[in-house]
Amino acid sequence: MLCLGIETSCDETAVALVENGKCIGSILGTQAPLHALFGGVVPELASREHYRCLGPLYDKLMEDAKVTLADLDVIAVTRGPGLLGALLVGLAFAKGLALASGKTLIGINHLHAHLLVAAIEEPIEYPALGLLVSGGHTHIYKIDAPDIFILLARTLDDAAGEACDKFAKMLGLPYPGGVIIDKLAQQGIPDPYLFPRPYIHNSELDFSFSGLKTSAAMYLKQYPQLIEEGQRYCSNNSKVAIKEELYNVCSSYLLAISETLYIKMERALQKYTNEIKTIIVAGGLAANSFVRQAMHNLAINYNKKILLPEQKLCTDNAVMIAYYGELLAEKGYCHRLDLSAIPRGQHIPDDMVKV
């Protein structure tokens, strides 16, 4: 089975081909330099860039892989969650291909795809406990099968990835700042008492990171020289000598986030410990060294198998869309052409048709 994947949920325009569980082609066009000028993603600009880039990227992918539209069995496209305008560009393109070719169309839940792409490298043993950590979402799922996801926890306010990007912005670092924070943090010595582990003094599995951001803002207000260090690093990058305090504060901040994720995942694991066979960590923040280490420690402590996608599969990509689309098609699922886009914050309906 050959599946085309299309991803346009935010600021990455991506297309990929997966055949029988293996990626045979993938192209990604990032808009990060454009949005960096504004300190974050501008939805209207993102939509226009998807519209400009998607067609040429598709043509190049098909040419490089030496396949045609007629060779495809399935067309999978992100239908949500994401920026509505951006989603509509990808959805319209996919529907056009499906209408012209008569191929199977499947709308993909972007969040579920993030978690299942780990299986492209190593099979998932179900049931699995999945942690999705990204700029827009922080969710814990119990995954009983590729088409059975049970949401156990979500963030009540800010996502973990957003908390990283906002901290980077406070320090005067460029967008997207999460990667830079991680790079700086790896050279620091974390202070485990500098920042709180938010929303842990309860029995809940849900997350809340707004208090951590507030704590960081208050700390930087006390020590404005850290902001000056961040701006110096930004202006001259690694060529300028940076004071160790900047490394240490970044390290302490990421330790607070990673330990919070550990605590909540441990609670979920204890609740289902006799059932869970695999821990999966996915999303953009799954590429963070502190998060990866914390989840490795969790898996070791509870003697569970852990799957962490390689870093290029942690951020938004079309490989995960094509891979998940193929899995669903093999189970007989598809969507009609009235498939709708679902923006962030709205429930994605279970409206697939089984044939």
Curated annotation (Swiss-Prot):
SUPFAM superfamilies xrefs: Actin-like ATPase domain
Report the InterPro entries cross-referenced here: ATPase_NBD, Gcp-like_dom, KAE1/TsaD, TsaD
According to its UniProt entry, the protein's GO biological process terms are: tRNA threonylcarbamoyladenosine modification
Q: Tell me the residue numbers annotated for binding Fe cation.
A: 110, 114, 316
Its primary localisation, in coarse terms, equals: cytoplasm
**EC number assigned by the record:** 2.3.1.234
Q: Which cofactor does it need?
A: Fe(2+)
Going by the UniProt record, its keywords in alphabetical order are: Acyltransferase, Cytoplasm, Iron, Metal-binding, Transferase, tRNA processing
**A GO CC annotation given for this chain:** cytoplasm
Tell me the residue numbers annotated for binding substrate: 132-136, 165, 178, 182, 288
Recorded GO terms, molecular function? iron ion binding; N(6)-L-threonylcarbamoyladenine synthase activity
Q: Which Gene3D superfamilies match?
A: 3.30.420.40
Reaction(s) the record says it catalyses? L-threonylcarbamoyladenylate + adenosine(37) in tRNA = N(6)-L-threonylcarbamoyladenosine(37) in tRNA + AMP + H(+)
Query: How does the cofactor bind to this protein, according to its record?
Result: Binds 1 Fe(2+) ion per subunit.
Compartments where located:
Cytoplasm
What the entry lists under Pfam families is as follows: TsaD
Q: Which domain of life is it from?
A: Bacteria
Residue ranges annotated as coiled coil are: none
Q: Does the keyword Secreted apply?
A: no
- Identify its protein family: Belongs to the KAE1 / TsaD family.
Task: Give the protein's biological function.
Answer: Required for the formation of a threonylcarbamoyl group on adenosine at position 37 (t(6)A37) in tRNAs that read codons beginning with adenine. Is involved in the transfer of the threonylcarbamoyl moiety of threonylcarbamoyl-AMP (TC-AMP) to the N6 group of A37, together with TsaE and TsaB. TsaD likely plays a direct catalytic role in this reaction.
Q: What is this protein called?
A: tRNA N6-adenosine threonylcarbamoyltransferase
Organism of origin: Lawsonia intracellularis (strain PHE/MN1-00)
